[in-house]
């Protein structure tokens, strides 16, 4: 999710907390929390106002650094740990972490899930592994406590479930080896039950196989590429640090009489492949009230789509988009900051592309320069921890599937990293 849309979603979550309604699709016209001011913390990545994305961009930076063999600086890890509330949740950003969280503190499910993934990736080589372990457990416990009856999560605690938030939580479960099917709501619903409710059938004329962000007020689903990229990864049981699955298999869309999360994920990959086939990039519509009404390239979600396609065994379909990003994303990444560099690094990793030679940009160098200098790669450990995040529950997931229509068990097993 791009920072501007995180800002809008955070604002809408604030509205929900105040009791004025449930969180819906992001809108820049919504009221927003007061942006932070003053000097930024020394341990934080990026130089822009972190009100809406401080924890998110820090977490993505950690994931990308571990994926390239670097261990984030202890100062940076300590900053992220300090953002956690006593109940285990993470807000989007706390300007003064010495003040305890209260009822007015905006707890952010996306930030919490991203932080859980990040801390799980760095904990073994951090200065305080036990502290990081405790933070991961507390974050996971909080996410369980705010799970909606339908099995999913909204952006803010208590908000209506959406595909993106539910997917990033599934990624956190993947990173910590927790089975999503064991993460059930009071009604006995799993995160996959929630995701399937957002999946469009292959017969849908506008978005066959896609996922919606949320149903509209009338309950109708509309294809959303951002949600589809996120839900495709989640349906495959993957975290944000996913890798290329092999052998290659062109994604197709198939409706089952009894839908499954993995089939829905492959249908999502089919939608992404078709959407990227012509321009090789996704687009974002103008935000409400914008003077420029033309669609613009969506660099961040294009990178996410590349990861999702590669994880689904469709790296051939992902490569044109990856090459488009190599040629066109430099200015966007420079303007957007560390989270953008991290997204591009994860896309490069998923397609086995060198992130140090990404077009004319060394993505690793640019990311590392955006915050405290990380520890140099340890060749004995390399990115082992990051690798483990990607395969947290692949084996039990495959065994639990039994039979998957259209996908051989050998194909699924070959997607494992170990």
Show where each model-derived region lies.
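Preference for long, amphipathic alpha-helical scaffolds in soluble/luminal domains
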Residues: 2-418
